[in-house]
From Swiss-Prot:
Listed GO CC annotations: cytoplasm
Cited function: Together with the chaperonin GroEL, plays an essential role in assisting protein folding. The GroEL-GroES system forms a nano-cage that allows encapsulation of the non-native substrate proteins and provides a physical environment optimized to promote and accelerate protein folding. GroES binds to the apical surface of the GroEL ring, thereby capping the opening of the GroEL channel.
Gene giving rise to this polypeptide: groES
UniProt subcellular location: Cytoplasm
CDD domains in the cross-refs: cpn10
SMART domains: Cpn10
SUPFAM superfamilies noted in UniProt: GroES-like (SSF50129)
InterPro entries in alphabetical order: Chaperonin_GroES, Chaperonin_GroES_sf, Chaprnonin_Cpn10_CS, GroES-like_sf
GO molecular function annotations of the record: ATP binding; metal ion binding; protein folding chaperone; protein-folding chaperone binding; unfolded protein binding
PANTHER family per the UniProt record, alphabetical: 10 KDA HEAT SHOCK PROTEIN (PTHR10772), CO-CHAPERONIN GROES (PTHR10772:SF58)
Name of the protein in its database record: Co-chaperonin GroES
Length: 86
């Protein structure tokens, strides 16, 4: 896949959460919320503090979903990122 976000935008792939709770209860797919963290796949030329392969946390409704090569990604502005997981 060749995709370069413009300006201060990032291309992010969601990171799936665990399917069970701490007590061992299995959460069905239709009851799960979309994850609010993801891996940075590509960054635009104006993004300064976030790098490719960083895992970031963002708002539940941030970004726009797109499909590239059959996979789902989010495109969002860097201001939608709350922080980087270290």
């Amino acid at each position: 896949m060749n995709f370069k976000p413009l300006g201060d935008r990032l291309l992010i792939q969601r990171v799936e959460e665990a399917n069970t709770t701490a007590s061992g209860i299995i959460i069905p797919d239709n009851a799960k919320e979309k994850p609010s963290k993801g891996k940075v796949i590509a960054v635009g030329s104006e993004v300064e503090d976030i790098n490719v392969d960083d895992t970031v946390v963002f708002g539940k409704y941030s970004g726009n979903e797109i499909i590239l090569d059959g996979e789902e990604f989010l495109i969002m502005e860097s201001s939608d990122i709350f922080g980087i997981l270290i």
